[in-house]
Amino acid sequence: MLTLDTLNVMLAVSEEGLIEEMIIALLASPQLAVFFEKFPRLKAAITDDVPRWREALRSRLKDARVPPELTEEVMCYQQSQLLSTPQFIVQLPQILDLLHRLNSPWAEQARQLVDANSTITSALHTLFLQRWRLSLIVQATTLNQQLLEEEREQLLSEVQERMTQSGQLEPILADNNTAAGRLWDMSAGQLKRGDYQLIVKYGEFLNEQPELKRLAEQLGRSREAKSIPRNDAQMETFRTLVREPATVPEQVDGLQQSDDILRLLPPELATLGITELEYEFYRRLVEKQLLTYRLHGESWREKVIERPVVHKDYDEQPRGPFIVCVDTSGSMGGFNEQCAKAFCLALMRIALAENRRCYIMLFSTEIVRYELSGPQGIEQAIRFLSQRFRGGTDLASCFRAIMERLQSREWFDADAVVISDFIAQRLPDDVTSKVKELQRVHQHRFHAVAMSAHGKPGIMRIFDHIWRFDTGMRSRLLRRWRR
């Protein structure tokens, strides 16, 4: 079967001109003009897609098959070119019959040309072939235009669908032209309106939590280069958190006598239900003689000191990818879950704007992974946002997964971010020592985004930076009131 590309070559039909005309008509369509005016950042991204469209159209024309009737007519034309004038005269009745049988547009004109001349001369032979060639060129051009029109309709439908999706997501995920271009590339997947509306929903939630958005932006800008100190010696007040022993619920350290009802031993609590021993229970409660669990831990207090002011010049460092671990335990459900997902969406926005990678790991009893900055980033983001936080907490496995990822060459300059309430068991010593080694030797930075004011200091002290966003009701009301 003859291909359209071969036919174009045989008849010297310029398909490039037809393709360019089609693309110009597509870009000038009213739908795209309105979209470009509304979303100017996406105009450059769509324009950058033109070479891909051009290549796809070339491929479509190259692979298209010529109809059998036109193929047979072209073969007859090629054979007729090889005939001498006497041979052509002999074959002419068969040629005319073939053209009539194939319903060729040239058939009627060919018969009229022959009937108008009683003698077939060499000049008439040449004229017959020239006009036949023109007829074939018209048919080939029409076939090209039909195929390109079909492709234009399909391409316009695809572009309109992607424009609708990108237009919805552009205010949420595109912070500059780089992000707009990457967002347009991601929109090539097959998504339904209800799917990406989930991203819109969490984007609106993020806008309602400006403090959370600012926190993500501060974390994204936190990597700075070597500082150059200056010799200015003014004093300033400096506040820092210091760790000290305290009775916080981290681990059981033994038994003690106290009046702490929340930490009573079960036998002591049982005496309260016995009438004869009830007064004895109250006496021991007043005298702080009840047997209770003794808990050991650490807490933090603010220490105020004075130190010389040090002015520094900062040279911005290249920023690496994000590896974000999200705690999906039951305690992270509800408002915590919304904040954690919205925070990851904010990091995705930063990653798209700065051409960084954003890799999400959900940890509870198992680890689930998503890459939000890849070609399928929007689909991955939708799957991530669809997850429910109902598991347990296995922080050690989370750190092991992070460390395994940091060993690979492509993640050597990554920053690790752990989003949790940090109400969990202490980390094993081998995990702690490995994290410290990565911080010391490879300069990897570990960030904690604490969603609770009750996170265990013993866990959180391993991080380079702690970004606090208290999701308690009191803090939520205070933030709303300050706005």
From Swiss-Prot:
<dbReference type="InterPro" id="IPR008912">
    <property type="entry name" value="Uncharacterised_CoxE"/>
</dbReference>
<dbReference type="GO" id="GO:0005829">
    <property type="term" value="C:cytosol"/>
</dbReference>
<comment type="function">
    <text>Component of the RavA-ViaA chaperone complex, which may act on the membrane to optimize the function of some of the respiratory chains. ViaA stimulates the ATPase activity of RavA.</text>
</comment>
<keyword id="KW-0143">Chaperone</keyword>
<keyword id="KW-0963">Cytoplasm</keyword>
<comment type="subunit">
    <text>Homodimer. Interacts with RavA.</text>
</comment>
<protein>
    <recommendedName>
        <fullName>Regulatory protein ViaA</fullName>
    </recommendedName>
</protein>
<dbReference type="Pfam" id="PF05762">
    <property type="entry name" value="VWA_CoxE"/>
</dbReference>
<dbReference type="InterPro" id="IPR036465">
    <property type="entry name" value="vWFA_dom_sf"/>
</dbReference>
<dbReference type="InterPro" id="IPR002035">
    <property type="entry name" value="VWF_A"/>
</dbReference>
<dbReference type="InterPro" id="IPR023481">
    <property type="entry name" value="Uncharacterised_ViaA"/>
</dbReference>
<comment type="similarity">
    <text>Belongs to the ViaA family.</text>
</comment>
